[in-house]
Design a protein with these regions (language model features):
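C-terminal charged interaction modules
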Residues: 78-110
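Active-site- and interface-proximal helix/loop "cap" or "latch" segments in soluble metabolic
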Residues: 19-86
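Structured beta-strand/loop patches that form or line metal/cofactor-binding pockets in enzymes
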Residues: 1-7
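Short, acidic, Ser/Thr-enriched surface-loop or helix-capping motifs
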Residues: 12-13
Length: 110
């Protein structure tokens, strides 16, 4: 059986706030760790029937980028729902939410 790994290396300040987030994966095209400003990982716990989440962001990630990041995450869920369940209605509803959120952040003062 083939195996693959994803690794995260998080540098924390004295208050345990992420200063630097690095990641690497065995299937990543380039070699070595790459910096990221935020990660959001969701895991389904089959025993508890709930989702475990890990959300981290570096303290220098701009708020505007954080909002875009979460809209991108939600949009990715739309494709995941469609691919994994075939539920076109649910995928379309998620996409519509993303479109509303994009309009919302575009209308916010800079």
């Amino acid at each position: 059986m083939r195996k693959t790994k994803i690794n995260f290396d998080i540098e924390l300040d004295q208050n345990n706030v992420p200063e630097k987030i690095m990641w690497d994966a065995t299937d990543k095209p380039e070699t070595g760790f790459t910096e990221a400003k935020s990660i959001s990982i969701s895991l389904w716990d089959h025993e508890q029937k709930n989702t475990m989440r890990i959300d981290l962001w570096s303290k220098d990630m701009p708020v505007e980028e954080m909002k875009k990041f979460y809209i991108d995450c939600i949009g990715g869920l739309s494709q995941s729902v469609l691919s994994s369940t075939g539920d076109e209605h649910m995928a379309a509803e998620i996409n519509e939410l993303c479109e509303r959120l994009v309009k919302y952040i575009r209308n916010q003062p800079q």
